[in-house]
Amino acid sequence: ELGVLQSLLAYHDAQMDYATQDHNGNGALEYAQRIFSEPGKHDGLYWDDDGDGDVSPLGPLFGQDVVGDAWYGYHFRILDAQGPSAPGGAYSYLIGNQMSRGFAMVAWPAKYDDTGVMSFMISHDGQVFEKDLGPHGDRLAKEMKRFDPDDSWKVVDVAAGD
């Protein structure tokens, strides 16, 4: 599960880096709403090197994966809102169709009790949370609409590696 924690921290850093540039020419700085960019675009955190000198925030290792495949035995999904248990309370990260108010991600085991047990969440605040969603965690994570670490989610000491 250490690889998953490192991946979430890399996601956080990549989002912070991504939001320093206007990638779609609309004059607004925003966070990426996808991990993998559409071909020929820079609308996600990873894109193939197209020779323009603009390096994707996530780098080539993430790009070797196929969308939908497990990474370190986990699935990852970007969330575009947060709930009442999150710092700052409940709100959408979207203003119109731009994710400029924050970001979050959930990661859950591809095969519960085989590739992992714990599920994890991170938001723009950079704090990682964990919870055992149980054998139905795949369904629960896919239904998750917002970053909402209530009391059942525990803070992960990332410096200690879990």
Predicted regions and their residues:
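Short, low-complexity, Pro/Ser/Thr/Gly-rich segments in the mature regions of secreted, periplasmic
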Residues: 151-162
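A short, surface-exposed interaction/processing loop segment used at functional sites
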Residues: 118-153
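Membrane-proximal amphipathic alpha-helices
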Residues: 1-8
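Extracellular/periplasmic head regions of type IV pilus-like filament subunits
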Residues: 6, 13-118, 122, 132-133
